Swiss-Prot record:
Assembly notes: Part of the 30S ribosomal subunit. Forms a bridge to the 50S subunit in the 70S ribosome, contacting the 23S rRNA.
Role: One of the primary rRNA binding proteins, it binds directly to 16S rRNA where it helps nucleate assembly of the platform of the 30S subunit by binding and bridging several RNA helices of the 16S rRNA. Forms an intersubunit bridge (bridge B4) with the 23S rRNA of the 50S subunit in the ribosome.
SMART domains, per database record: Ribosomal_S15
Naturally occurring in which organism (per UniProt): Pseudomonas syringae pv. tomato (strain ATCC BAA-871 / DC3000)
Family recorded in the similarity comment: Belongs to the universal ribosomal protein uS15 family.
Keywords carried by this UniProt record: Ribonucleoprotein, Ribosomal protein, RNA-binding, rRNA-binding
Protein origin, superkingdom: Bacteria
Chain segments annotated as transmembrane: none
An annotated GO cellular component: cytosolic small ribosomal subunit
Protein's name in the database: Small ribosomal subunit protein uS15
Molecular functions per Gene Ontology: rRNA binding; structural constituent of ribosome
PROSITE patterns named among the record's database cross-references: RIBOSOMAL_S15
Amino acid sequence: MALSVEEKAQIVTDYQQAVGDTGSPEVQVALLTANINKLQGHFKANGKDHHSRRGLIRMVNQRRKLLDYLKGKDVSRYSALIGRLGLRR
């Protein structure tokens, strides 16, 4: 259910600010978004899986906190990231 190593590596290379950057808010938000999107399909098939739903809610909250941080630091990077990921904020 989790992202494969190849998928993670592709996301990191797409959103990194510099070579080897894995901790920037953009990379973290992109990884969380990919995990959240993958879990959405799981919940369509397994609607009663409440333990995984708790993990999903935790990921959504973490992504929201990172987006709020990025919005406070640099609004242009925030806007670009939201546009790229297709988030509604």
